[in-house]
């Protein structure tokens, strides 16, 4: 326990909180251009071909971003919006592309959880 005199001299130090998404620079989303669109395999014990793109952001950062949902229309030079949110089984992928924004289309024939995939309400 610190004495009153020690606290007067120094004060309590606040712990420095490190961001999980440094490339966003405290913004909710950032725009960027795809430099590479590819698939990669997840860590054990999972098995899949996960769709990922490398994005050069407007602030100069280059990051890997996961493309969620079934099927996408992204290719090199597509302009995308990215948000934070890591993919647990893909090391180094700390961002998600926002479906239905800018050049990234929404998921076709999506009926549930549509807002997360930029899908319009189906005509019933």
Curated annotation (Swiss-Prot):
The highest taxon in the source lineage is: Bacteria
MF-aspect GO terms: rRNA binding; structural constituent of ribosome; tRNA binding
Instruction: Give the keywords, sorted.
Output: Ribonucleoprotein, Ribosomal protein, RNA-binding, rRNA-binding, tRNA-binding
Q: Where is the composition biased (Basic residues)?
A: 113-124
Instruction: Give the protein's biological function.
Output: With S4 and S5 plays an important role in translational accuracy. Interacts with and stabilizes bases of the 16S rRNA that are involved in tRNA selection in the A site and with the mRNA backbone. Located at the interface of the 30S and 50S subunits, it traverses the body of the 30S subunit contacting proteins on the other side and probably holding the rRNA structure together. The combined cluster of proteins S8, S12 and S17 appears to hold together the shoulder and platform of the 30S subunit.
Q: Which residue ranges run through the membrane?
A: none
Q: Which family does it belong to?
A: Belongs to the universal ribosomal protein uS12 family.
Q: Is-annotated flag, keyword Metal-binding?
A: no
Q: Which GO terms describe its cellular component?
A: small ribosomal subunit
Q: Does the keyword Transferase apply?
A: no
Name by which UniProt lists this protein: Small ribosomal subunit protein uS12
